[in-house]
Amino acid sequence: MTRESINIGGRRSKLAVVQSNHVRDLVQAKFPQYDCTVFTLQTLGDQIQFKPLYSFGGKALWTKELEDYLYCEDQEKRLDLIVHSLKDMPTLLPDGFELGCVTKRVDPTDCIVMPRGSPHRCLADLPEGAVVGTSSVRRSAQLKRKFPHLKYQSVRGNIHTRLEKLDDPEGPFQCLVLASAGLVRMGLEDRITQRLHSDIMYHAVGQGALGIEIRQGDKKILQILDEIADLESTVCCLAERSLMRTLEGGCSVPIGVESSYDHKTKKLLLKGIVVNVEGTMAIEDQQEVVVNDIREDSIKCGVLLAHKMIKDGAKKILDEINLERVIQQ
């Protein structure tokens, strides 16, 4: 008797393959009757390595090519689900697609990585004019507020490529800012010099979580994903994505968040910050909601916080950022 198969898609980078294999293992452990196969594809974001993400607006850079295969006419090539770093998923998906689930989140913080042998242990140790490598305007904008004496330069490439650039004695960087989760998943946690908590930097929407994208209304796959979803991660990430969607920001716009959910009290706390590119203006606020309906109340929390922040001037900052991006293009 032929075993039924589930085709899992993801990007080709080493980190993406680790993440896709992790989801495959989660599904296989719960549903041993299925054959789970991982397929990898190159996306537009993988192909364009010479321009900063900020100049693209960040929407669908990592998802479009994979989405096409969810509706592929060739059944052998057709994907049943796609594994994304949730922070790379647009908050508004095209018709015919939906976020099927969020798996358990890994450390959502950003971190500082110093070159091997560096005497410096934190950002505050770095001398004036030291160059910090980051591909994210959210990161550089927030750090400019706290460390205006440092310089910030775009760095692209996968984790190993960035670390090679950092460790090169002839390279320009005195440190890198990376997502802690990526290093943890790649077995490189020992490279983390300093974790950046919210007193220094709010993390990206969905950072550290995996989002599983599926065909809209695919009941069979939804039932499978229900078994590997994580409640706390789902609640927090739905709220974070709702905040970003309401503020109309793409994944490279400087919106930072921090969220927590208490299972006993059902209280969800969402904090958010919007910073201009120069790091000279910031709107920061928070919202608490009791979650009775997981989807409805989590989304409501993000909407309420967004409206607070818009009232305080966040929209003005975001409009200026979007105008600057159009001029650069």
UniProtKB/Swiss-Prot annotation:
The answer on whether this UniProt entry bears the keyword Transferase reads yes
Q: What is the similarity comment for this entry?
A: Belongs to the HMBS family.
**One annotated Gene Ontology cellular component of this protein:** cytoplasm
> Where are the disulfide bridges?
none
Q: Which domain of life is it from?
A: Eukaryota
According to its UniProt entry, what is the function of this protein?
Answer: Tetrapolymerization of the monopyrrole PBG into the hydroxymethylbilane pre-uroporphyrinogen in several discrete steps.
Q: Which residues carry this modification: S-(dipyrrolylmethanemethyl)cysteine?
A: C251
Q: Which GO terms describe its molecular function?
A: hydroxymethylbilane synthase activity
Q: Which SUPFAM superfamilies match?
A: Periplasmic binding protein-like II, Porphobilinogen deaminase (hydroxymethylbilane synthase), C-terminal domain
The record's listing under Pfam families reads: Porphobil_deam, Porphobil_deamC
Q: Which PANTHER family match?
A: PORPHOBILINOGEN DEAMINASE
Alphabetically sorted, this entry's keywords are: Heme biosynthesis, Porphyrin biosynthesis, Transferase
Q: What else is known?
A: The porphobilinogen subunits are added to the dipyrromethan group.
Keyword Transferase tagged? yes
What gene does this protein come from? HEM3
Per the record, the GO terms for biological process are: protoporphyrinogen IX biosynthetic process
Its needed co-factors are:
dipyrromethane
Co-factor note (free text) = Binds 1 dipyrromethane group covalently.
**What name does this protein carry?**
Porphobilinogen deaminase
According to its UniProt record, in which pathway does this protein act? Porphyrin-containing compound metabolism; protoporphyrin-IX biosynthesis; coproporphyrinogen-III from 5-aminolevulinate: step 2/4
